[in-house]
Amino acid sequence: KNRPTFCNLLPETGRCNALIPAFYYNSHLHKCQKFNYGGCGGNANNFKTIDECQRTCAAKYGRSS
């Protein structure tokens, strides 16, 4: 199973001006990081919690443990 492709997207604040704490997966650093979401628009690399981000994007895909 492969990591979802949206995990590679850069964080997008979106069109609105709210400052909602959110998390995105940084594919270069291989970890989830905080960013401010504007409240609308953006892309799928946007999670309400760091746990949700890690479960979706930071899990070990395609590697044997």
From Swiss-Prot:
InterPro entries per the UniProt record, alphabetical: Kunitz_BPTI, Kunitz_BPTI_sf, Prtase_inh_Kunz-CS, TFPI/VKTCI-like
Signal peptide feature range: none
SMART domains xrefs: KU
Subcellular localization(s) per the UniProt record: Secreted
Keyword tags: Disulfide bond, Ion channel impairing toxin, Potassium channel impairing toxin, Protease inhibitor, Secreted, Serine protease inhibitor, Toxin, Voltage-gated potassium channel impairing toxin
BPTI/Kunitz inhibitor domain residues: 7-57
Disulfide bonds: C7-C57, C16-C40, C32-C53
Transmembrane intervals: none
Known tissue expression: Expressed by the venom gland.
Effect the entry attributes to changing N17L: Increase in chymotrypsin and elastase inhibitory activities. No change in trypsin inhibitory activity
Annotated site location: Reactive bond for chymotrypsin: N17, A18
Keyword Disulfide bond: yes
PROSITE patterns associated with the record: BPTI_KUNITZ_1, BPTI_KUNITZ_2
Gene3D superfamilies in UniProt: Pancreatic trypsin inhibitor Kunitz domain
Coiled coil feature spans: none
Gene Ontology cellular-component terms listed: extracellular space
Pfam family, one: Kunitz_BPTI
Molecular function terms from GO: potassium channel regulator activity; serine-type endopeptidase inhibitor activity; toxin activity
Assigned protein family: Belongs to the venom Kunitz-type family.
Function, in words: Dual-function toxin that inhibits both serine proteases (high activity on chymotrypsin (Ki = 18 nM), and low activity on elastase) and voltage-gated potassium channels Kv1.3/KCNA3 (IC(50) = 120.0 nM).
Other remarks on this protein: Negative results: does not show inhibitory effect on trypsin.
Protein's recorded name: Kunitz-type serine protease inhibitor IX
Species, as recorded: Bungarus fasciatus
Organism classification: Eukaryota, Metazoa, Chordata, Craniata, Vertebrata
